[in-house]
Amino acid sequence: MSSIKIECVLPENCRCGESPVWEEASDSLLFVDIPAKKLCRWDSLTKQVQRVTMDAPVSSVALRQSGGYVATIGTKFCALNWEEQSAVVLATVDNDKKNNRFNDGKVDPAGRYFAGTMAEETAPAVLERHQGSLYSLFPDHHVKKYFDQVDISNGLDWSLDHKIFYYIDSLSYSVDAFDYDLQTGQISNRRSVYKLEKEEQIPDGMCIDAEGKLWVACYNGGRVIRLDPVTGKRLQTVKLPVDKTTSCCFGGKNYSEMYVTCARDGMDPEGLLRQPEAGGIFKITGLGVKGIAPYSYAG
């Protein structure tokens, strides 16, 4: 077993860092700071970080096949021109719910951008429940709604054979699976594949590795856990020096490194003294497993 190394590669002080995505073409990590309305790009070679501030909370970002990026900003799916620091609205959801915003999002293997909504929090993980929905933005910019009654729409990914969609609604304390139709984007037959244990706290962002196992960041649990979605067993726990771990992705050379985002919001001064790296970007090496490249939006 190789020895696992955890380091804070960027002391960013994110209020709520989220949605890490590796951009292979630029050796960069994209991520967002939701309440700060910031989209960030960290160059792993120069160690420089560029930040763009939007006019509403930015909750997820993804690569786009035609260049640039797509992001969920407020309740809008947007296309981003990084150089011009501008966003073009592609679609808007939840028009009837003024207190809602998007949360986590990710592109599926067919190039659709899946993302879900939630009510704005009054404090971390404190919010009006059942207000969210799960959507996807198709390449032709039409939006499909899958279901509503969501608390905090969160981590999502697809099995390596593209037949299963994995999804987290945080306050269900469960990682769920659906049958998934790659051609149509339909999902069906929801079931739970893992229920979190008490010390694991709240399931947040998620990614899949090259062996088809799931990695889940546990908010307030200070860890990422590796799950086998077939057996429902936890295979590994990696603890970080911060409690509010929010999301994870693979990146770096051959996708052999894991990047983890975290949050500072909701921590008291004593907690921040104890965890000075809270809000930073962490890199985990030596996991002995690789990830897969992120999919790009096809529209």
Swiss-Prot record:
A divalent metal cation binds at residues 18, 154, 204. This is Regucalcin. Gluconolactonase with low activity towards other sugar lactones, including gulonolactone and galactonolactone. Can also hydrolyze diisopropyl phosphorofluoridate and phenylacetate (in vitro). Calcium-binding protein. Modulates Ca(2+) signaling, and Ca(2+)-dependent cellular processes and enzyme activities. It catalyses: D-glucono-1,5-lactone + H2O = D-gluconate + H(+). Its cofactor is Zn(2+); Mn(2+); Ca(2+); Mg(2+). Binds 1 divalent metal cation per subunit. Most active with Zn(2+) and Mn(2+) ions. The physiological cofactor is most likely Ca(2+) or Mg(2+). One of its GO terms (molecular function) is enzyme regulator activity. The keyword Cell cycle does not apply.
